[in-house]
Regions:
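Conserved donor NDP-sugar-binding/catalytic core segment of glycosyltransferases
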Residues: 1-14
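Conserved nucleotide-sugar donor-binding catalytic segment
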Residues: 7, 17-101
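Catalytic core of nucleotide-sugar-dependent glycosyltransferases
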Residues: 84-92, 96-121, 141-154
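Generic helix N-cap/helix-start motif at coil->alpha-helix transitions
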Residues: 122-127
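Residue-level recognition of tetratricopeptide repeat
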Residues: 157-158
Length: 168
């Protein structure tokens, strides 16, 4: 997995993925998707072994996240490099830029992989926290606040959520 430049309308951001430890199942579930589909090369057989990408309608925008989770369950080892070898163009109207749709898709992915309720609540809380941060970054403070509240309801012990609530 390599680094990328993310091109937005007004700025370019360098994004570096990894370290390898982030590709472990529990980290993927509790921290969210940390791998770019366009920044990875995997043997076709490995993808076929885990039943490829899901075509379920409810996880559109998070199909890659589901695939990474399935691959991590197989203890696949990824190599991460800090070299920037690609560019990702961000469009405001793209499917993956739709925060609420992507959050709901990620939630469906997580619910399909976690049975333990405590772990599930932590992972879902993180989904809403990520959504809140994205809304806040976009200047949508009301939506950010709502997302942080949903996050807090699922995990009262994450003190970072209280901080985000204060600033949103």
């Amino acid at each position: 997995c390599h680094g990328e430049y993310w091109n937005n309308e007004d700025k370019t951001t360098k994004v570096i993925y990894g370290p390898e430890d982030n590709f472990k199942l529990e980290k993927l579930l509790l921290r969210g998707n940390c791998i770019s589909l366009s920044a990875i090369v995997i043997k076709k057989e490995k993808i076929i072994d885990v039943d490829c990408f899901s075509t379920k309608q409810e996880i559109i925008t998070a199909e890659d996240y589901d695939l990474w989770i399935k691959l991590s369950k197989q203890n696949l080892k990824l190599h991460f490099t800090t070299k920037v070898l690609g560019t990702y163009q961000i469009h405001k109207n793209s499917e993956s830029s739709n925060i609420i749709r992507n959050t709901h898709a990620s939630i469906k992915v997580i619910e399909g992989h976690i049975k333990d309720q405590v772990l599930l609540n932590k992972a879902l809380s993180n989904c809403w926290k990520i959504a809140g941060k994205l809304y806040y970054k976009n200047g949508s403070n009301k939506d950010a606040f709502k997302s942080f509240m949903k996050s807090l309801r699922l995990n009262l012990y994450d003190i970072t959520i209280y901080f985000y609530l204060i600033i949103s």
